């Protein structure tokens, strides 16, 4: 993976994570710490961090739907 592609993947993953935390907070009413715990410990997290499967290019809303399954 080129450095530029890695930077893009990192940026998109970080963006998706911040949106996922917001979605969890909105849907559950929990605080940011609890929301981050739910997102970072969810089964979808390893797939989101895997740059080869490119889940990070999907919309945060789609990733959130996957996280809820």
Which stretches of residues belong to each language-model region?
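C-terminal alpha-helical interaction appendages
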Residues: 1-69
